[in-house]
């Protein structure tokens, strides 16, 4: 803003005739390798079954226990994730990865004090997992919310609607920060926490709690400050006590065709609601995150196609899709991919035989600076059961998330892919509805 093709079935070692007093066989290396391979392929449920078998055979297997916690976190099954990660910490108290992921469990529950406490003993300035995947776990920022409820909702009714100021090149909306005048934000699920332009944040006097290196299009990096705001007003609702990121955004205003871009609404805000980006109607809909809201939505008119998703890192929504005639693969849902419907890793472009149109290359801007953008066309792209043909794609350099999460990501689906639909994000059951 890892790609194995084969699946090895492993037979259970313990047969029904095992003697009660017999020592439990230890998991074989082939079982462990098979589970790891399934995880790398993105087959999380299948991998989880094998890791569970391994833990039954050896309850002290740290790696399998940690992976069960990781898979539960990907699936947003937070109680299960907490159980397995706490077991992993008990097995290896000095290993930081389980503590970092446990902190993310509490972060997703908006229990910022427990999230900060979970990072006790972790070298937060150098921990690779925290820096690369969970940068929002800033201890000073989290601790600043003591005595407050993060993302506290103030407003009446079961939903609020906010018209897009414009839909192209990305949806843009008017919001208020800290009760001030209306300002212009764009919507981008490729982003995590609400983001503010650096200068706008200075004008507001936003407190700062340090900086991280953000990763953006083309593998570029830029410094991102971390802070907090008192409130964000979206439609008729006001959300109080929000962590925010800060980076230069006003430089993007011309590309959006607006006077001034002051911020971004990303996935973390969406996560707190049953959220719809309704492209055909040109509006953002936030509904309370309740069972009743979901049931009411499901009963509303219109055919809905549900696509299961997982959430890696602090905001990477991924789901199964296909590119050309290649086998099914995981794709990242990045509605902030501008001017294209898909962006693929270079390895996938080559494997699919996709031709880059170098004669149509242009210069563009990303969160990390200027980029050379080369277009291409993908004849067939699917996401879940939604299939589209002749989808515009773009290449702007390395795809830094291809192997970052321990499983293979082929690329991302973006604005042009989703704009025919109303896209609803259900984080309670981890699915996206397209209608």
Model-based region annotation:
Residues 11-20:
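Hydrophobic h-region of N-terminal signal peptides that target proteins for export
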Residues 20-435:
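Pepsin/retropepsin-fold aspartyl endopeptidases
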Residues 1-8:
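Bacterial N-terminal signal peptides that target proteins for export
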Residues 9-12, 41:
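Enrichment for repetitive, rod-forming helical segments
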